[in-house]
């Protein structure tokens, strides 16, 4: 018997093809493939947003993927999946910060956590740990919007266009905010030394 159609391996499909399958067919295997591709990085995004509170980050990550499942049918197949995912994650962060008083607690805890990490670092990692400590300390003093912008652009490595989509602002605004943020970081890190 000759097979006219071959089963497509999910690993060869793009994120956009997978989310389209989730939306059209509620394909759990396609959803699981998306989860396996993006959960780790998304967890890292939430860990930074929630100041390394693993429980809060895990809850937010799970809630984001629940929202992805529920909203998959609304995904615009002409757009990219990753900015859409991070838009959901960003909006969830904003909502959680708006409805809680954790932001201040996280700022003070971040300094203590970073100092502990620094003390535990080995001699070989001393310079990197010093830089990471300084960067984390400086970023902890910045507003949530600036920390989110930094995370999306430099830690999640989204393009300017993708960051603009996630934050729902013009690309030019993203460019100017990134430039201003980098200038502020440069100045404060210079002052930190």
Tell me the role of every PLM-derived stretch.
Residues 1-10, 52, 105, 134-137, ...:
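C-terminal edge and immediately downstream basic/flexible tail or linker adjoining helix-turn-helix-like DNA-binding
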Residues 3-7, 23-33, 43-63, 171, ...:
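Short, charged helix-capping/linker segments at alpha-helix termini
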Residues 23-24, 48-52, 63-80, 99-100:
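Sigma70-family region 2
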Residues 59-66, 79-91:
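Structural recognition of an alpha-helix C-terminal capping motif at a helix-to-coil junction
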Residues 37-40, 48-50, 151-158:
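Short helix-capping/turn signature of helix-turn-helix
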